[in-house]
Curated annotation (Swiss-Prot):
Domain annotation LRRNT: ranges: 26-52
Protein name: Toll-like receptor 3
Cross-link (Glycyl lysine isopeptide (Lys-Gly) (interchain with G-Cter in ubiquitin)): 766, 813, 832
Record's keyword terms, sorted: Disulfide bond, Endoplasmic reticulum, Endosome, Glycoprotein, Immunity, Inflammatory response, Innate immunity, Isopeptide bond, Leucine-rich repeat, Membrane, Phosphoprotein, Receptor, Repeat, RNA-binding, Signal, Transmembrane, Transmembrane helix, Ubl conjugation
Extent of the signal sequence: 1-25
Length: 905
């Protein structure tokens, strides 16, 4: 016994140790949706306890030196294996043999130095192979010959001196070949012959010290759509040579960023004449001279980036030939400002005249003095123009500033950060289709008469935030009734309290920002007519006096009529009162921000109409009490609540309801444990609100409600019981009558046997008068009923006992008329009852009906007749009623019993 116990303890200890080992090993990796993440775990070997059905395994940033094929036998379903950022120096060919479904293999940032013919011989299903940042200096033989499905191959940041990756045509499905940051000096046709049947979407040779492009080097590639040669330090001569080598190829995208291409001429891109080049990136080249006709051979170009250059001048023929250009970026493309005015960049009139299909023009962050009368002439398709921080001398916008855009269908104009101080009347009269006008972050200080916006008949948004000073008038926005968004944040706004309101014409306005203006005086009709307003930002003003009861004329309800308001921000307004009815009829409010005010006691029912509220912010106020009368309605559908940093009074009267709500709600309450603290009473100071014990709170309201509900339920129950006791039989009678009038009395009997009598009646001799008196009329009323009565239906000349047996067999049912006489009748007790029961037992049928004319206890019934009420279904047990009015109900129940099916037990 002792040995057995020791063995069990040893086994249990071993299993426990194994379980701990498995859990600790598995728990290091995160497994989710067949993806195992084992990165950053300092692993030195492949985990062997992961689920066998994983399809993705991440082993990056560990200390692996090898990928032993046998360790992957368990994971034969792997499709993606990422082993980057390890110390792997050799890859065994059998790895892909073990992983036949492998499609993506990432080995970047390892220590691979050479690749043999056998390395990837079994990796026939690979679509992506990443060998970036290894120590591969030379590719020998044909290591990628079997990779017929490979789409992307990354060999960037190695030590390769040649583009030759094999002999003979291979990699037929390759689309991306990345060879950036190697030591390739020349592109030779014989070294690119292996790509003879490839259609390269992208060939990246960036950051290589290229010095030579041999004749036909790109012609040997099947198809080449995109070539990246960024940071290759190509001089103008090499660039021109490159373009000639790309002639008659499929090239569409050419990136030559950061190549110190100081100047371009008509011959620079002439070799691209016989291509369909659509994208050209010349950014970061310190380009200072764009010669006339530089792009004349690029009629298919749609995207041109000249960002971050040092262009001194654009002439009328600088963009000649770009008849299909859609996107042009000149962000920070011009010479930066210096002391000498002569060094300012110059854009001649009609410089953009050839760009008739240009839709997007970005000229941000330049130092152009200002616009001229024909600066943008010819841009007849321009829709987006960004001029942020573009001009140095555009302090005043006049009706001549944008005259060159008169024929442009401009939709968006960005003029931020240009030191604009004044907008003259009719400045934008040329821009009838403009939708968005951004004048923010300037130095505008003026009174808005409304004529500034003349001609903006389709304007959707005007952004004027972060300017110096704006004074409104009643007609400030009278000419832009289509306006839907108006931003006036931090503009030292004046004259807001005039009547009629400056915003009255803006019937379509949905967003209005008046924040950070120190507004103290407004009228009740400030927002009159803005029925479509959805967002109102009024934070960081000084509205405290306007909502005080002591305010002359009473509180100012400037929110009335905003029936579609969704978001209201009144943060930091010094509010210490909220008048009753100020939020009335604002049924669609989803978010209210009243944070950083001085609110303390809130009136009951002020939020009653805010049952759709999703977010409520009351942080950093002086709220001590959170009561149901105030916060019950808005808390119903709340998703987010912020009441941090309030001095809560932790008493039953003040916060018991709030604490109960907190402990039951799913609403997001950030920093509940740390920033919802009790302030009073003293012994609760600093105590977390959610830990306040409400069990001792004696709130009578719930008990009153419980008393009312329980009392009502008890009264209803008593009434129902009395009704059933007094009139239950009548209810049952009418119910049964209704049911059987619809469905009929007889149930479907599946037995094929036919009976001559509906029922054989067993009764005592002394009860024969009662039987004849009540069963005979039933036969007369219902012709389908026929009872077997001894005095009438026994065959003449047949012995009595034999007649009884025959009659019972020919009857569908057997009725017992039970009285004290029956219990004493010797014939019934000895023969009739026993034979009837025996037949019922033999046939296994519910064919017996008991009619009690007298109240006979069950034990007497059992003793005399060997019967009990529990042997029969309830509808087969009938009691003769004392009251005459219940006789009809009795007859109905008897008909139901007679019509019931003789179902087997």
């Amino acid at each position: 016994m002792k040995g057995c116990s020791s063995y069990l303890m040893y086994s249990f200890g071993g299993l426990l140790s194994l379980w701990i080992l498995l859990v600790s090993s598995t728990n290091q990796c995160t497994v989710r949706y067949n993806v195992a993440d084992c990165s950053h775990l300092k692993l030195t070997h492949i985990p062997d306890d992961l689920p066998s059905n994983i399809t993705v395994l991440n082993l990056t940033h560990n200390q692996l030196r090898r990928l032993p094929p046998t360790n992957f036998t368990r994971y034969s379903q792997l499709a993606i294996l990422d082993a980057g950022f390890n110390s792997i120096s050799k890859l065994e060919p059998e790895l892909c043999q073990i992983l036949p479904l492998l499609k993506v293999l990432n080995l970047q940032h390892n220590e691979l130095s050479q690749i043999s013919d056998q390395t990837f011989v079994f990796c026939t299903n690979l679509t992506e192979l990443d060998l970036m940042s290894n120590s591969i200096h030379k590719i020998k033989s044909n290591p990628f010959k079997n990779q017929k499905n490979l789409i992307k191959l990354d060999l960037s940041h190695n030590g390769l001196s040649s583009t030759k990756l094999g002999t003979g045509v291979q990699l037929e499905n390759l689309q991306e070949l990345l060879l950036a940051k190697n030591k390739i000096l020349a592109l030779r046709s014989e070294e690119l012959e292996f790509l003879g049947n490839s259609s390269l979407r992208k060939l990246d040779l960036s950051s290589n010290p290229l010095k030579e492009f041999s004749p036909g080097c790109f012609q040997t590639i099947g198809k080449l759509f995109a070539l990246l040669l960024n940071n290759a330090q190509l001089n103008p001569h090499l660039t021109e040579k490159l373009c000639w080598e790309l002639s008659n190829t499929s090239i569409q995208n050419l990136s030559l960023a950061n190549n110190q291409l100081l100047a371009t001429s008509e011959s620079t891109f002439s070799g691209l004449k016989w291509t369909n080049l659509t994208q050209l990136d010349l950014s970061y080249n310190n380009l200072h001279d764009v010669g006339n006709g530089s792009f004349s051979y690029l009629p298919s170009l749609r995207y041109l980036s000249l960002e971050y250059n040092n262009i001194q001048r654009l002439s009328p023929r600088s963009f000649y030939g770009l008849s299909n250009l859609r996107y042009l970026s000149l962000k920070r493309a011009f010479t930066k400002q210096s002391v000498s005015l002569a060094s300012h960049p110059n854009i001649d009139d009609f410089s953009f005249q050839w760009l008739k299909y240009l839709e997007y023009l970005n000229m941000d962050d330049n130092n152009i003095p200002s616009t001229k009368s024909n600066t943008f002439t010819g841009l007849v398709s321009l829709k987006y123009l960004s001029l942020s921080k573009t001009f140095t001398s555009l302090q005043t916008l006049t009706n001549e500033t944008f005259v060159s855009l008169a024929h442009s269908p401009l939709l968006t104009l960005n003029l931020t950060k240009n030191h604009i101080s004044k907008i003259a009347n009719g400045t934008f009269s040329w821009l009838g289709q403009l939708r968005i006008l951004d004048l923010g972050l300037n130095e505008i200080e003026q009174k808005l008469s409304g004529q500034e916006w003349r001609g903006l008949r389709n304007i959707f948004e005007i952004y004027l935030s972060y300017n110096k000073y704006l004074q409104l008038s009643t007609s400030s926005f009278a000419l832009v009734p289509s306006l839907q968004r108006l931003m006036l944040r931090r503009v030292a706004l004046k004259n807001v309290d005039i009547s009629p309101s400056p915003f009255r014409p803006l019937r379509n306005l949905t967003i209005l920002d008046l924040s950070n203006n120190n507004i103290a005086n407004i009228n009740e009709d400030l927002l009159e007519g803005l029925e479509n307003l959805e967002i109102l930002d009024f934070q960081h003003n000084n509205l405290a006096r306007l909502w005080k009861r002591a305010n002359p004329g009473g509180p100012v309800n400037f929110l009335k009529g905003l029936s579609h308001l969704h978001i209201l921000n009144l943060e930091s307004n010094g509010l210490d009162e909220i008048p009753v009815g100020v939020f009335k009829n604002l049924f669609e409010l989803k978010s209210i921000n009243l944070g950083l005010n001085n609110l303390n006691k809130l009136e009951p029912f002020i939020f009653d109409d805010q049952t759709s509220l999703r977010s409520l912010n009351l942080q950093k106020n002086l709220i001590t009490s959170v009561e149901k009368d105030v916060f019950g309605p808005p808390f119903q559908n709340l998703n987010s609540l912020d009441m941090r940093f309030n001095p809560f009074d932790c008493t039953c009267e003040s916060i018991s309801w709030f604490v109960n709500w907190i402990n039951q709600t799913h609403t997001n309450i950030s920093e509940l444990s740390t920033h919802y603290l009790c302030n009073t009473p003293h012994h609760y100071y600093g105590f977390p609100l959610k830990l306040f014990d409400t069990s001792s709170c004696k709130d009578s309201a719930p008990f009153e409600l419980l008393f009312i509900i329980s009392t009502s339920m008890l009264l209803v129950f008593i009434l129902v019981v009395l009704l059933i006791h007094i009139e239950g039989w009548r209810i049952s009678f009418y119910w049964n009558v209704s049911v059987h009038r619809i469905l009929g009395f007889k149930e479907i009997d599946t037995q094929a046997e036919q009976f001559e009598y509906t029922a054989y009646i067993i009764h005592a001799h002394k009860d024969r008068d009662w039987v004849w008196e009540h069963f005979s009329p039933m036969e007369e009323q219902d012709q389908s009923l026929k009872f077997c009565l001894e005095e009438r239906d026994f065959e003449a000349g047949v012995l009595g006992l034999e007649a009884i047996v025959n009659s019972i067999k020919r009857s569908r049912k057997i009725i017992f008329v039970i009285t004290h006489h029956l219990l004493k009748d010797p014939l019934c007790r000895r023969f009739k009852v026993h034979h009837a029961v025996q037949q019922a037992i033999e046939q296994n049928l519910d064919s017996i009906i008991l009619i009690f004319l007298q109240n006979i206890p069950d034990y007497k019934l059992n003793h005399a007749l060997c019967l009990r009420r529990g042997m029969f279904k309830s509808h087969c047990i009938l009691n003769w009623p004392v009251q005459k009015e219940r006789i009809n109900a009795f007859h109905h129940k008897l008909q139901v019993a007679l019509g019931s099916r003789n179902s087997a037990h």
